[in-house]
């Protein structure tokens, strides 16, 4: 694994209900995962907006799901809201060709991006509004908390910075190297704590936590790169990091300690979200990152209290999880038996 692999999620879309008995695992001494038990989850196909590929990114306590999907007969993809079996196209900014939804809060407000830069946007009761960031720089909104605070990144080329948007005011969160290096914010909890990653002046990329105006370097699992993707109400942080041996492993950071969550079915694991109960979701298996297709053999997982449970698919050869709500409902994407990638929902039986 090259040590310079960037862990940041790109803007590119990576892209039958079924029930299966899955395998639960716990990390062993060598960082991999050992078989310990079996658990049953139901995988539900949420479909697409007519095209052959869709991915679910987030789910709120009410079970509303957001993500993006290709449209029928076009190369365009649009943000969607799925609720009670119905997937709704959220549209784009005027003249826009694509949009994507990255997060949804308990009130149903959705954030993401839309073509035209792209630019960070928020959907409120179906009304799409562009967030005011800085000049005409591209931007993307990655998460929104119950208070309506939004985080993401803005900028292009040599300068990309994390931002916090609150009640119409945008704050540049800075980086580990001031204005000279890049940063991105990916998640925010109810307390307003923000996580993401930042370059350092020495050229490394580290997971970071912003809390009360202070940025904290969360370190790595021994390599030179890490990236945080989720934070719980209690301040537990999840993400992925290069290890000393050059593999990418999921981590859980709590009270100053970063723990390797191990892998299953291959050398790779990536954590993408965490809920209030400390349940962590992501994907594990062969060494293929998001945007690199096809990730044959990868499986979505949920990790809790040292146990990694590998989830099933919609009949195809891979699945990935990207979000989890307080009820433990998990969303992501999976290959179907028909060879399409559909948005997916996993629930515990």
Residue ranges of predicted features:
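C-terminal motif of bacterial Sec signal peptides marking the signal peptidase cleavage site
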Residues: 15-17
